[in-house]
Amino acid sequence: MFFKKNKKKETSSMANGEDTKKLDKKELIDEAENLINTIDSVSGDERIKVLNRIGSLYFEADKIDDAIKYYEISISENKSLGKAYTELVKLYNIKRKEAISKKDDESMKHYIEKIDSLLQLSKDVIRGRV
């Protein structure tokens, strides 16, 4: 009576057999490339949104280096904490872990320094120095 589990109702899409699958890697990369072609035609906050979207698409497609590139551009143009900042921390940690597994000390140090610079940026933003 009190601890009965509620049964979830099937949504209409599940009942129809439709899958709400993610886009495959090729579609993600194609969408990112289409957005890259529009970067020069936008400016300000819209440009930052496009750069972040490109980074996000590449991240979903497991193109880590490309994702890092566009998030870094976004951060360099708009020094604020947000999606680009949090995603870059994740990406740098992924690259750092890869370097550790390959026993590549130089790459590991490089990504630790990148993470440190992001932490410094966050301190500067919070203190109003940027």
What is each PLM-predicted segment?
Residues N37-S41, I75-S76, H110, S117-Q120, ...:
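Conserved structural position within tetratricopeptide repeats
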